[in-house]
Structure formats: C-alpha cells, structure tokens
C-alpha cells in the first residue's frame, strides 16, 4: 500500500466503529519524505510525504470502509527535566541547544531522547534530569531531522 497524504486525525472522530491498524513512526522519522513500514497487522506501507509536514500521532493515512491505518509514535527512553524557575529553564535550553539535542515539551516537562553523556552533563551543571519512557510528539521548535550546522571560525 502506498500512502501520499494524511486524511484526518483520529482525535477528530469516534473510533468505536472503526477497525484500527497502526503504523509505528519513530519521533525522528516524522518529517521524512519517504518511509517504508510494516503495520501492526503486517501490511507493508509506503509513505510518500510530499507536502513536507510532519506526521503526527493519530494521523489517519488510509481508510477503506471501517478500516483505518493510523500513525502511532512509540515510546522511547528520554531524559526529562522539570525546570523549577526561569534560571533552570534557561540552563536546560542552553545545554540542550549547545549539543543540538532535539527538545520536546509535555505540560511542564522538557524531554529529549536518552543519551548518557548528556544526562551526566545535565547533572554536572546542577540540573535534576531523570530517565522516563515517553512519546516524543510535541517538538519545541528547532532541529528534528538530525541535520546540524557547523561553527566554523
């Protein structure tokens, strides 16, 4: 099956009458233009994202009758911080940005994919990070696709 656009998002509808099949898209794949995946029910899915918009949790990629194929972003190990004041918020953003770490937000938690050296660096600079399994669905701007820039002087 080849999919070229998002039809709608499941948050907008009642799922009770639908037969839902999920395709897992990792947080770092949501902006890829071409993906090849296997759905939970074993259906091979080709996704051609020509409009460049990031896929979101709950996006419906295909529907036929009462059957739908829905994007699911799996949980992954994350570094989580809950800044208690503006100083901690600034320090967190500075340290993560300095390492080009993707930053996500959920309520009052800032999250980035788990990386032991980053965890140790955050502890060393006086912050209180902890490890937690999270869905990275709400990016806080910046670099999601792994591209970086250089600091040539």
UniProtKB/Swiss-Prot annotation:
One of its GO terms (molecular function) is unfolded protein binding. The keyword Nucleotide-binding does not apply. Pfam families: UreE_C, UreE_N. Signal peptide: none annotated. It comes from the Bacteria. It is found in: Cytoplasm. GO terms for biological process: protein folding; protein-containing complex assembly; urea metabolic process. Keywords: Chaperone, Cytoplasm, Nickel, Nickel insertion. GO terms for cellular component: cytoplasm. Involved in urease metallocenter assembly. Binds nickel. Probably functions as a nickel donor during metallocenter assembly. Belongs to the UreE family. This is Urease accessory protein UreE. It comes from Acetivibrio thermocellus (strain ATCC 27405 / DSM 1237 / JCM 9322 / NBRC 103400 / NCIMB 10682 / NRRL B-4536 / VPI 7372) (Clostridium thermocellum). The lineage of its organism: Bacteria, Bacillati, Bacillota, Clostridia, Eubacteriales.
């Amino acid at each position: 099956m080849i999919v070229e656009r998002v039809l709608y998002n499941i948050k907008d509808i009642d799922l009770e009458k639908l037969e839902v099949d999920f395709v897992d898209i990792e947080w770092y794949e949501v902006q890829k233009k071409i993906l090849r995946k296997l759905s939970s029910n074993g259906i091979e899915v080709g996704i051609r994202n020509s409009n460049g918009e990031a896929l979101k949790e709950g996006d419906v990629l295909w529907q036929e009758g009462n059957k739908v194929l829905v994007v699911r972003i799996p949980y992954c190990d994350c570094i989580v911080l809950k800044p208690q004041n503006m100083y901690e918020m600034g320090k967190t953003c500075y340290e993560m940005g300095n390492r080009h770490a993707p930053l996500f937000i959920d309520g009052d938690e800032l999250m980035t994919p788990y990386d032991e050296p980053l965890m140790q660096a955050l502890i060393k600079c006086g912050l209180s990070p902890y490890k937690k399994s999270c869905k990275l669905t709400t990016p806080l701007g910046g670099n999601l696709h792994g591209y970086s820039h250089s600091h040539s002087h």
